[in-house]
Structure formats: C-alpha cells, structure tokens
Amino acid sequence: KCSLKGRKISYDTGKYLAEKNVNVVNGLALGCDTEALKGTIAGGGRCIGILPAGLDDILPKSNQKLADEIVMKDGCLISEYPVGTPVKKYQYVRRDRLQSGLSDGVLIVEAEEQSGTMHTVEFAQNQYKRIACYYHKLVELSSGNRKLEEAGQISVLKIKKGLKSLLKL
C-alpha cells in the first residue's frame, strides 16, 4: 500500500539519489518501492532489485518490465535462490535482510507497523545501519514511521529538506 503522496515522494527521492550517484536497493514491491526505482531510472541512476525467489520469477509479475529495464540500465537483480525456486512466505523476510545488508542505510517513506519494511528496519538496526523516515500525516499508512519516531530510534526527515539532509546522516 502506498498513498499518492508516498508515490511522489518515493519517485522524487529515487531521482534525487540517482542524481547524487547513490544506488537504490529495494525489493521491487508495488507502491513506494516501484516508484523509487522508476525515479532512480529517470534520474540516470542504478537500481538493485532483491528477489524473494529465483531470478526467473519476478514478483510481483506486474514489475517484469521494470525488472528488465533495471538490468538494461546497468542495474542488477539479486536472489539467494537458484532458478526455479518457487516463492514461500518466509523468503520475503529473508529478502528484507538482504535489502538492509546491501545498503548503507534504510529510508522509509510509508510503512505500516506490520509490514515488510519493518522487517527491513529490524535487520538494519541489528546491522547498525542508518535509518531515516519521512514525517507526514497519513497515520494509517505510516504507523510504522510513527512508532519508530516515538521510540527515538531513527532520524525523521521533513519532506522539503529531507532529501538534502538524508545524504548527511
């Protein structure tokens, strides 16, 4: 799930990071992940897509064209599973571990408390990675953001100044 505002923030963030020569790593999920990758490509950047199954099984299927474009634009797709491995639910959580492990930090646009993004955050905390989130008022789609903010566990970015301060964390 991702709001229209979250989609725009994700796209703009991906584009900005690409223009600053920062690679974007995510799991090709629908919503914020997809928009961040599209923005990164539009900005001339490189994307790394982490798959929860074998490289022959792009999930969600609707992102097949995006996955192809990532590879054609000098990005890559990574899986820890052999070709032909069908996806199982636990593999999504393992994918979240890889997303964090391959990243310098984790940026949360919108995350519900019970979401894959929160798995990625937990792995990032255990790996001593930088974690930041955007602050916005869409409580129903950003309850995970709020929880982390209230616990004082992350840097909170304001929309307008957030992108510049992100690279200074």
Stretches with model-predicted labels:
Residues 1-169:
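Glycine-biased, small-residue-rich flexible motifs in mid-sequence functional cores and linkers
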